[in-house]
């Protein structure tokens, strides 16, 4: 069947509306048989020809006691067939029943495994949602889960293509809704409501139970692929969107692995972990072995390109109708796998369309066991090579350390001999003893050095001790040299400081002397000046009456300066004053100056009289 016909049929099955073909009629069965040549109807022994208006046939003795299914007669002149699911349990494989539900809106499943017959073409008004949702909890074969995933992906692809046929905008909205549903951001009810709002076409009522029953399988597959790719489910879905919305693409990871998680009490088990613990070969689960008979199709079991035969092939009586239907279903999709595909079947990430939709048997074949033993043998050989290389490296390192230790002992002996030579000359007796026992003594030293090492093996403590002693000796010498250099530097610094201090003191003394000389020069200049006071240096207004040369600002400065001035005062007038005193010996001179009185009494040169009044000599 081509992709276009699949899309047309499925898009027509999704929407409820008037149908031109009568469901359950011979023409309808003829058209359906022509559309699906691989239907299990080819291998059934009792084809159904009951018209929809007849009640269901009574249960036979082989089917056991079952609940009588409710049946509502229906005519097709109204709005198409009734939109509810029949009572009863479906076929364990669930392939053709759900395909017919999606395609034609009728139940065309084979006889149920557990004995409950399904209604041929009628639809009951019972709780179809609960009965359909309970299908996901039944222990179905892994291949059935793979087919359910394939149908769900085809259903979502048909939805997206139907929206794209309406308009590109609606197709984009439908694609966003599908991605949100798979990504768990939308619930099934929200998806249903928004899809109906986007397309203005209502879906059939069995779509919601179908999604509730099969959407968790697709979400588990998405989560498993995302974990293998080390991504979040949203990231993985964004990168591999074509795997979901492309009808020709296959799943990148085998979906039977995900279904095994559901069938085995929800335990997550990857292929590697299953191979390690070997739990799938546990003989305590016979029902599990009976389920494993459905993991591979008969064509794949008998394929000559699979290498060695399966260790425990199921006997021929265990083939059932499900296996035959599966062989018909996978007749085109399965081809003989090539050895390269067998080697690469455990790779989680593959190019879309490069792998077939197959179910992997986790039990190891003899070839895989041989490869495992080969890998283990190569691993052990690598470990042995590493151990041998390590042992050789340790031997070489030990020899090098022994050579270094011998050289270190030689240098230590040379150093000790040089130290003894520095301390003083060796006594004659000791020197003769050393000369007599030269080679023998050296041999004894070597024997003494190596005897405990040969007894105790490798002793690094002595080497470290001698090396530390040599290093400490070098440190001591370096410290002594450093102390000498520091002391010399300190001595030179002190000498330099002393020299600079002496220079500074001499400079200060010279500056003080120069300052005193400058002060004396200023004083002398002030004394020579006739405009300033000889005592204080201020502007002079009076003149000494004795010498008529000294200038003072007042009588206070004159009396203050008299102790120094009386030595020079009147010397220039001493001769004329004596000549004046001779012709007038008896005349009292009321205005005689102190210099004249001093000259009159030469016997008292050191006790001059008080200075005369200034106003007598200074004109007013």
Curated annotation (Swiss-Prot):
Q: Could you give the subunit structure recorded for this chain?
A: Heterodimer with RUNX1T1 and CBFA2T2. Interacts with ZNF652 and ERBB4. May interact with PRKAR2A, PDE7A and probably PDE4A. Interacts with PLXNA1, PLXNA3 and PRKAR1A. Interacts with HDAC1, HDAC2, HDAC3, HDAC6, HDAC8, NCOR1 and NCOR2. Component of a TAL-1 complex composed at least of CBFA2T3, LDB1, TAL1 and TCF3. Interacts with ZBTB4, ZBTB38 and ZBTB33. Interacts with HIF1A and EGLN1.
Region: Interaction with HIF1A, residue numbers: 151-243
What is this protein's name? Protein CBFA2T3
The protein's matches in Gene3D superfamilies, at most eight in alphabetical order, are given as: 6.10.140.2220, 6.10.250.230, TAFH/NHR1 domain (1.20.120.1110)
| Composition bias type Basic and acidic residues, residue spans | 264-290, 334-344
Q: Which residues form a coiled coil?
A: 465-520
Q: Where is the composition biased (Low complexity)?
A: 590-604
Segments for region (Nervy homology region 3 (NHR3)):
462-510
Q: Where is this region: Mediates interaction with PRKAR2A?
A: 462-483
**Binding of Zn(2+) 1: at which residues?**
533, 536, 553, 557
Please report which protein family the annotation says this sequence is part of. Belongs to the CBFA2T family.
Q: List, as start-end ranges, the regions of compositional bias called Pro residues.
A: 49-60
- Keyword Coiled coil belongs to the record: yes
Domain writeup = Nervy homology region 2 (NHR2) mediates homo- and possibly heterotypic oligomerization by forming a four-helix bundle tetrameric structure.
Subcellular compartments: Nucleus, Nucleolus; Nucleus, Nucleoplasm; Golgi apparatus membrane
């Amino acid at each position: 069947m081509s992709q276009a016909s699949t899309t047309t049929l499925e898009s027509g099955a999704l929407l409820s509306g008037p149908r031109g073909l009568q469901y359950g009629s011979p023409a309808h069965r003829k058209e359906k048989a022509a559309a699906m040549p691989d239907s299990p109807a080819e291998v059934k022994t009792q084809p159904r020809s009951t018209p929809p208006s007849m009640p269901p046939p009574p249960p036979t003795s082989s089917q056991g006691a079952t609940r009588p299914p409710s049946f509502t007669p229906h005519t097709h002149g109204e709005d198409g067939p009734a939109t509810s699911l029949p009572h009863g349990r479906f076929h364990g494989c669930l392939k053709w029943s759900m395909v017919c539900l999606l395609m034609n809106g009728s139940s065309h499943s084979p006889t149920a495994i557990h004995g409950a017959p399904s209604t041929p073409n009628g639809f009951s008004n019972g709780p179809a949602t609960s009965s359909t949702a309970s299908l996901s909890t039944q222990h179905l074969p892994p291949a059935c889960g793979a087919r359910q995933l394939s149908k769900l992906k085809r259903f979502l692809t048909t939805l997206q293509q139907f929206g794209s046929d309406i308009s590109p905008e609606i197709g984009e909205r439908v694609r966003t809704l599908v991605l949100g549903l798979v990504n768990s951001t939308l619930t099934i009810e929200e998806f249903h409501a928004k899809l109906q709002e986007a397309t203005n076409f209502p879906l059939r009522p069995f779509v919601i139970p179908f999604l509730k029953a099969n959407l968790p399988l697709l979400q588990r597959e998405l989560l498993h692929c995302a974990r293998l790719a080390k991504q979040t489910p949203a990231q993985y879905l964004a990168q591999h969107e074509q795997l979901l919305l492309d009808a020709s693409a296959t799943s990148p990871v085998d979906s039977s692995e995900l279904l095994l998680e559901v069938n085995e009490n929800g335990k997550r088990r990857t292929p590697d972990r299953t191979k390690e613990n070997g739990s799938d070969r546990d003989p305590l689960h016979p029902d599990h072995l009976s389920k494993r008979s459905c993991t591979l199709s008969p064509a794949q079991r008998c394929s000559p390109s699979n290498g060695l035969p399966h260790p425990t092939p199921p006997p021929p009586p265990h083939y059932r109708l499900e296996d035959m239907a599966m062989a018909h279903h996978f007749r085109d999709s399965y081809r003989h796998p090539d050895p390269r595909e067998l080697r690469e079947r455990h790779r989680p990430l593959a190019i879309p369309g490069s792998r077939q939709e197959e179910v992997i048997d986790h039990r190891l074949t003899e070839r895989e066991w041989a490869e495992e033993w080969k890998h283990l043998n190569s691993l052990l050989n690598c470990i042995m090579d590493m151990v041998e290389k390590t042992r050789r490296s340790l031997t070489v390192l030990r020899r090098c350390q022994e050579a270094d230790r011998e050289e270190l002992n030689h240098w230590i002996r040379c150093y000790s001999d040089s130290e003894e030579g520095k301390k003083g000359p060796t006594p004659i007796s000791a020197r003769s003893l050393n000369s007599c026992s030269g080679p023998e003594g050296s041999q004894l030293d070597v024997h003494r050095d190596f005897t405990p090492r040969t007894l105790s093996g490798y002793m690094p403590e002595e080497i470290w001790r001698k090396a530390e002693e040599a290093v400490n000796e070098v440190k001591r010498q370096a410290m002594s040299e450093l102390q000498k250099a520091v002391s010399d530097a300190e001595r030179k610094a002190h000498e330099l400081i002393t020299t600079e201090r002496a220079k500074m003191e001499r400079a200060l003394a010279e500056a003080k002397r120069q300052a005193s000389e400058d002060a004396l020069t200023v004083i002398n200049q002030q004394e020579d000046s006739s405009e300033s006071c000889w005592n204080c240096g201020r502007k002079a207004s009076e003149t000494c009456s004795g010498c008529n040369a000294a200038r003072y600002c007042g009588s206070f400065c004159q009396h203050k300066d008299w102790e120094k001035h009386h030595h020079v005062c009147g010397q220039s007038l001493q001769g004329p004053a004596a000549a004046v005193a001779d012709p007038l010996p008896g005349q009292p001179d009321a205005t005689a100056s102190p210099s004249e009185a001093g000259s009159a009494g030469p016997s008292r040169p050191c006790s001059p009289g008080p200075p005369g009044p200034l106003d007598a000599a200074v004109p007013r």
